[in-house]
Swiss-Prot record:
Protein name from the UniProt record: Small ribosomal subunit protein bS18c
SUPFAM superfamilies according to UniProt: Ribosomal protein S18
GO biological process: translation
GO cellular component: chloroplast; mitochondrial small ribosomal subunit
Species assigned in the record: Psilotum nudum (Whisk fern)
GO molecular function: small ribosomal subunit rRNA binding; structural constituent of ribosome
Main localization (coarse): plastid
Keyword Plastid carried by entry: yes
InterPro entries on file: Ribosomal_bS18 (IPR001648), Ribosomal_bS18_CS (IPR018275), Ribosomal_bS18_sf (IPR036870)
Subcellular location: Plastid, Chloroplast
Length: 75
């Protein structure tokens, strides 16, 4: 895949600390989910491995508790 064919999604800054990442903080978690409802990769979010794991676990918990949808049906 050529670089021009890749998605040109703007990357997020890694200013998140691990103590703020919580499954109840839906506004923060939505920053790490794509338009289609997928969890964004570390390359896209620029998080450390520990932060990415924490975000992933929090998103999965929020999905199970129905705070976040599993898929985004709006698009």
């Amino acid at each position: 895949m050529k670089k021009s064919e890749r998605s040109s999604r703007k990357r997020l800054s890694a200013t998140v600390t691990s103590d703020l990442i919580d499954y109840k903080n839906i506004d923060l978690l939505r920053r790490f989910i794509s338009e289609r409802g997928k969890i964004l990769s570390r390359r896209m979010t620029k998080l450390t491995s520990k932060q990415q794991r924490s975000v992933t676990v929090s998103i999965k918990r929020a999905r199970i508790l129905a705070l976040l949808p599993f898929i985004n049906r709006d698009s």
